[in-house]
UniProtKB/Swiss-Prot annotation:
Gene3D superfamilies: Zn peptidases. It is found in: Secreted. It comes from Trichophyton verrucosum (strain HKI 0517). Zn(2+) 2 binds at residues 191, 227. Residues 411-497 form the Fibronectin type-III domain. Zn(2+) 1 binds at residues 171, 191, 254. Keywords: Glycoprotein, Hydrolase, Metal-binding, Metalloprotease, Protease, Secreted, Signal, Zinc. This is Probable zinc metalloprotease TRV_03476. It comes from the Eukaryota. Residues 1-24 form the signal peptide. Glycans are attached at residues 100, 121, 242, 424. InterPro entries: FN3_dom, FN3_sf, M28_fam, Peptidase_M28. One of its GO terms (cellular component) is extracellular region. Binds 2 Zn(2+) ions per subunit.
Amino acid sequence: MRFLISSLLSGLALLTSLHAFVLALPREYTIAMSNPFHESLFSCPAASWPRVKLGSENTPQEPSKDLRKILSQISPKRIEATIRKLVSFGTRHTLSTQTNATYGIGAARDWIESEFQRYANASDGRLTVKVVGYDQQPDGNRIPFPVRISDVVATLKGEGDPERVYVVSGHYDSRNSDPLDYKGIAPGANDDASGVAVSLELARVMSQRDLPRPKATIVFAAVAGEEQGLYGANFLAQSFRNSSTNVEGMFTNDIIGSSTADDGTKEPHVIRLFAQGIPPLNVENQAMRERRIMIGGDNDTPARQLARFVKETAENKHTDMEVSVIYRLDRYLRGGDHRPFLEAGYPAARFTEPNENYAHQHQDIRIDKDPKTGKDIQYGDLPEFCDFDFISRVGKVNAAALWNLAMSPGMPRNVRVNTNALSNDSKFSWDPPAGGNALVGGYEIVWRSTTAPFWTHKMDVGMVQEATIDLSKDNVIFGIRARGKNGERGVAVLPFP
């Protein structure tokens, strides 16, 4: 009994001491002790390491007065009218007739050209339009006979650095359940009249004579042959490559027509942006790829730097959209027109709606049973399933990204980090953008932790071409970007040793 009483007294004393210890702890620790899953048990003050007092927070870039004017004029009604007009051609299958004035892909091509030309006529010579193409021979797959592939291209030439080019496109061809059925109805409202509508609407708004010309050139394209094998986009990308055109960014808008999934889930203020990681081997050879992996640069490819730029400049109250950057080339089992541009060595990314309804893609028009519920549902890519306000907001995201890109000085070249000796600081050097320093107001070093998706810090280093920062290159990811004379940021570039 004496032993038991002694043990109880000792235990009570221990509990009293423990209670006093707990009371002395900071509040966040006492909360954690009462909750074994509290976040403070999985984090600590060192989680923000390396702690740096250099530079400043990298905040989003607000749209300029001119850009706000552009965004305010993007019209859901015009986008709807464009989509319904394209659907009215019955089918826009790449293999369909090109001689009928009201039916088939030829009629759609001619109408798109006429719309671009109408905007060009009102632009005081700023916008020019042409149809380019080639004869595609049978490929043993989805091209069973020779066919003309035509791309409709409208060019808003820049003033200041016109040799630097940005491209936005949608594909105007369509298909139904059978990829070789070129006679049956294939409305293609979402896939991809929605993307073509954005190209047309941006060309209309951005080419207006009461706006300043962009510094760089913007190309608005409607391409064919996507459903048969990305043929139109490949032709356009290779044409740019063959002429040594400096394309510093390309966006394809493909399936951007609806914010509603097959289960009714709605995300009307989110757009996905797909950005590839390691470039194709024909763009970066094996040695370059190994260097990229060695320095941890696999998440800092040109495509992903472009996506970061979009996130930073096009996600705001004026677009009313969140840009959800997806770090992969595309969705599973799918492909898009950004891929040929990537394979040509150009930074490119794909915009696609957040939720897809596969009953409204690549389907014959019919009422049939839903395999999940057994209920009758409407199949087919019809305008009634499009959200035209949503498409206009996606158009605003594109406009914000393109205008900011075209008004920026472009990307610095030959960006390097010095690794000649061991050191705890980081020394960088770079060359001006391809257009020189005429548009540059200064340069910035940006950085983030190796696990962060987007830039968190920046430091203005002025009009120099080399700089040293008291922060170890071993601990963060760095980028170098040019800043325009009015503060317009360019796309950051990863420094290589």
